[in-house]
Curated annotation (Swiss-Prot):
Protein encoded by which gene: glmU
UniProt superkingdom: Bacteria
NCBIfam families assigned to the protein according to its UniProt record, in alphabetical order: glmU (TIGR01173), PRK14360.1 (NF010940)
UniProt subunit comment: Homotrimer.
Protein name, entry field: Bifunctional protein GlmU
Amino acid sequence: MLAIAILAAGKGTRMKSKLPKVLHPLAGKSLIDRVLSCTHGLKPNRRLIVVGHQANLVEDSLRKHQDLDFVLQQPQNGTGHAIQQLKPRLKGFNGELLVLNGDVPLLKEETLSSLLKFHKESNASVTFLSASLDSPTGYGRVFTDESGLVKKIIEERDCTNEQRKNKLINAGIYCFNWQQLSDVLNLLSNQNSQNEIYLTDTISLLKKALHFEVDNPFEIKGINDRVQLSECEHYIQEELKSLWMSKGVSFVDPISCSLSEDSNFGTDVIIEPQTHLRGKCSIGNGCHLGPGSVITNSTLAENVLAIHSFINEATIGNNTSIGPFAHIRPESNIRQNSKIGNFVEIKKSCIGEGTKINHLSYVGDSALGKNINIGAGTITANFDGKNKHRTIIDDYSKTGANSVLVAPIKIGAHVTIGAGSTISKDIPDKSLVVERSKAIIRTKAD
């Protein structure tokens, strides 16, 4: 049996943030969500989250995971104290306990699988991840005997100058035999420079302690401040972009772009500089994004062009052109072969196939049919000061420049609306409508 405990109780004071450290985003996911993601394939019987500082925020952010058991650590008195809080929850449990940190987000599932396999085959009391670092500052040092058994781990702040020269470090990721661990947990003390109860002190109390060295030390990098957060963001972005370039996506200037891990691409996609994808995005074959576009939780079909535009929670059809400087807001559906031009805003609207809204227009809460032409400066006036109202325009209709359609309103098919008109009544099919005040012209002599 396998139980997994993720430590997420710390204050994260070096982040200088009101947000709990484990909730800071990294390539679109919180740190702790990333840690949870690498545990799914391990098929644990239990997953426990140790919370403390701003516990409610952390718990609320993880409600989508139905199998989590939250354990409160109050006060936060060290990693050993955190694991002591698990004893009532794991009463009667007979198996392995994998201990992870909520601020170590780059771990791979494969690494944890290898750790578990090594631990079980070695019949160890505890096995933990380790690494040899050229610059081990900040990490506890691992000390072994001639046979390779771990004798002790000393936290850096408690090391002598000579002990600090040791480059073998503890990554803080442990696999314990729970029964053996629970027998020694109450023997831990806080006799150290921090007056905290260290989980590392269990190493010298257990029968057989081993370490398992990781292939890629960056995988165990913890995040304590925003500099380290930025370093991890850069690392993930490089991984993501390299992956998609190997699958047929071109980045003109990769370093200036960012992706979310939930982004998916077809082939022959070109991504120009300063383009960013956030949340869950699906980008079809042959799309050309940017420069300067931001796409969030949206689906773009094939051969979509999006230049200097914001697309948020929208669906864009094949062979559609967006921008430059267009804003497609949530719940919008732009059908194939359409054009949304410069300085156009679309909000919660369906735009039919082949429809063109080329410039300087606002279309909100509307349903437009196919092959419609919306003239420059056309506005759907959807808000009466209290409620939003719908505008419907049927196929093959046209609006002249500077038209205002006052919702609720329905414009029929094959309707032409003259420039400068303000329309507040429904218009039947095949109509020509011009509604504007008569010009009054006077000479200066008058």
